[in-house]
């Protein structure tokens, strides 16, 4: 009898643990109806809050934004608070995968920005810009009409992004000195 009580207790604890983990993880399905002409930002670095501030200040820009990166949800939540006009959704997955970009409704997006991704990097580490080129190729295979803006740190990657049909290529020293 004591053994049965122990087994039931362990089983109940395991079920409760699974249910709590699912509740904390949240529901990652998005309502497709509000995503049309929206902005998708892939990658995370120190310039994202400045970009969001510019978008928030521009009344003519879209207010629906999807952030796709592997940065911790708490960091993203703290960074995006205070943008009253913007409807920001975070997908915490690897943006180089086609399935993840489809989850962000890239085929319906107005603009897709690819930024150097500092997710999980130490302060002295540089982001892998091959991910930018790969993501641009993946995005164009999903939606040729999507406006892809790629941000690179190394000028040598510009030719690769041109071959990948990026609509705009941003090089920090040349384009965004105020960020």
Features from the language model and the residues they span:
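Cytosolic regulatory regions of ion transport systems
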Residues: 1-179
């Amino acid at each position: 009898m004591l053994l049965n009580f122990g087994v039931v207790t362990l089983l109940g604890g395991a079920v409760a643990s699974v249910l709590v983990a699912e509740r904390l993880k949240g529901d990652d399905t998005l309502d497709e109806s509000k995503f049309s002409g929206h902005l998708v930002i892939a990658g995370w670095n120190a310039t994202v809050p400045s970009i969001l501030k510019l978008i928030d200040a521009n009344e003519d820009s879209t207010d629906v934004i999807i952030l796709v990166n592997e940065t911790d949800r708490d960091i993203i939540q703290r960074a995006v608070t205070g943008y009253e006009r913007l409807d920001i959704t975070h997908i915490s997955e690897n943006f180089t995968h086609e399935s993840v970009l489809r989850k962000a409704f890239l085929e319906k997006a107005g603009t897709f920005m690819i930024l150097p991704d500092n997710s999980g990097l130490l302060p002295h580490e540089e982001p892998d810009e091959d991910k930018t080129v790969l993501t641009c190729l993946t995005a164009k295979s999903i939606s040729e009409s999507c406006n892809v803006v790629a941000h690179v740190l190394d000028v040598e990657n510009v030719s690769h992004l041109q071959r990948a049909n990026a609509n705009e290529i941003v090089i920090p020293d040349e384009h965004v000195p105020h960020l």
